[in-house]
Amino acid sequence: MAARPRSHKISIPNLYCKLDKRTGKVYWQYKHPLSGRFHSLGTDENEAKQVATEANTIIAEQRTRQILSVNERLERMKGRRSDITVTEWLDKYISIQEDRLQHNELRPNSYRQKGKPIRLFREHCGMQHLKDITALDIAEIIDAVKAEGHNRMAQVVRMVLIDVFKEAQHAGHVPPGFNPAQATKQPRNRVNRQRLSLLEWQAIFESVSRRQPYLKCGMLLALVTGQRLGDICNLKFSDIWDDMLHITQEKTGSKLAIPLNLKCDALNITLREVISQCRDAVVSKYLVHYRHTTSQANRGDQVSANTLTTAFKKAKEKCGIKWEQGTAPTFHEQRSLSERLYREQGLDTQKLLGHKSRKMTDRYNDDRGKDWIIVDIKTA
C-alpha cells in the first residue's frame, strides 16, 4: 500500500496545497483574495510559501494605498487638505525649482544657493507638519548658522525659507499669509573684508608664480573688464567679434559688449592687449586656460573658479602684505577696484558692471574706509 500523505500545517493566508493521488505529489496554489482565482505555484513548498508571503504583502500595500487615496479624496470633498510634512513639501518645492531652472526662470547660482537652507530645514523640522512650524523653529536654524560665524549664509537661509512658505501658500498647503520665516529678524552681516587698493593689486600681481600664467590673465581680465569670477572663467575667444568682447553674465543674464579698445589708464593697458596676452602656443577655447598639463587638468583646459580663487589666495599670501584675520580681500574685490578706477576715468561703470540700478554700482564704489578723504580748502 502507498504511504499516507503527510499533513501540512499552513499558517500563510491564501496558500493551499493539493495532493495528486496519481503521482503522490503535493501541488501548491495561491488564491487571490480579491478575484478568488487560484494560481499554481508548483511542488516546491519553500518557494511556494515565499511567493505567497510576497504576494500577500504586495496586495496589502495596494489596498492600503487605495484606502488612503479614498480618504484623501473624502477630505478634499469636505473642503480640507491632508496635512503635509516639511520633508514632503521640500521634495515638492525642489521639483518646482528644478522646473523653473529648466525654463530659465531661475539662475543656476540661485538654484544652488537654495541647497543648504533646504537641507538645514529638513534636518531640523523634517517630521513636523508644515502648518505647525513656528517662527521659533526658523529662528533656531538661523541662530545656529550665525553661531558658526556665517552671517551672510544666515541671511540666505532666511530668504530661502521665506520663499519655501510662499510656494506652500500658492499650493494651498498653508493658509494665505502664513510665513513664520518672514516673522524672524533679518540677520545683520557686517562686511569685514577690506577693499583692494591698486598698490595691493600690483603687489599681488607681481607675486604670481611663473607656473600660473592663467592667474595673471585672470587678474588682468578682472580689472580691465570689471566682470565676476565665474564670467571671467567662462570667457572664450569665440566671444570676440565686431571688435568687441561679448559677455552674458551668469548671475543676472545681462548681455554686455565691451569694445576691445577699452583702456584702464591706471595700468596703461587695453582690453585688446590683455586678450593678446591670453593667446599663446596652447590650443584652447578659453581666455583663461592651463598652459601645462597637471594632475587635474590638461593643457588648454578651462581654469575653474575654485582654482583661480586658490591661486589668488596663495599669491596674496606671498606678496608680503599682512591683513587682519578675516579682512583680506578676495578675487571678487577686483570688481570693486575696477569700478573705482573707471569711475575716476569718467566711464559709465553701471553699464560696464551690468547693474540694473545705480545704487548697486555705488556700493562697489564704497572703499569701506580704506582711503583718506582729502578736504578741499580752496576758496571760490
UniProtKB/Swiss-Prot annotation:
Q: What EC number(s) does the entry state?
A: 2.7.7.-, 3.1.-.-
InterPro entries from the UniProt entry: CB, DNA_brk_join_enz, Integrase-like_cat_sf, Integrase_catalytic, Integrase_lambda-typ_DNA-bd_N, Integrase_recombinase_N, Tyrosine_recombinase_XerCD
Matching entries from CDD domains are given as: INT_Lambda_C (cd00800)
- Keyword check for Hydrolase: yes
GO terms in the biological process aspect are: DNA recombination; establishment of integrated proviral latency; symbiont entry into host cell; viral genome integration into host DNA
For this UniProt record, give its keywords in alphabetical order, as a comma-separated list: DNA integration, DNA recombination, DNA-binding, Hydrolase, Transferase, Viral genome integration, Virus entry into host cell
Ranges of residues in domain Core-binding (CB): 84-169
What name has this protein been given in UniProt?
Integrase
Q: Which organism is it from?
A: Enterobacteria phage P21
Where is the organism placed in the taxonomic lineage, from the top? Viruses, Duplodnaviria, Heunggongvirae, Uroviricota, Caudoviricetes
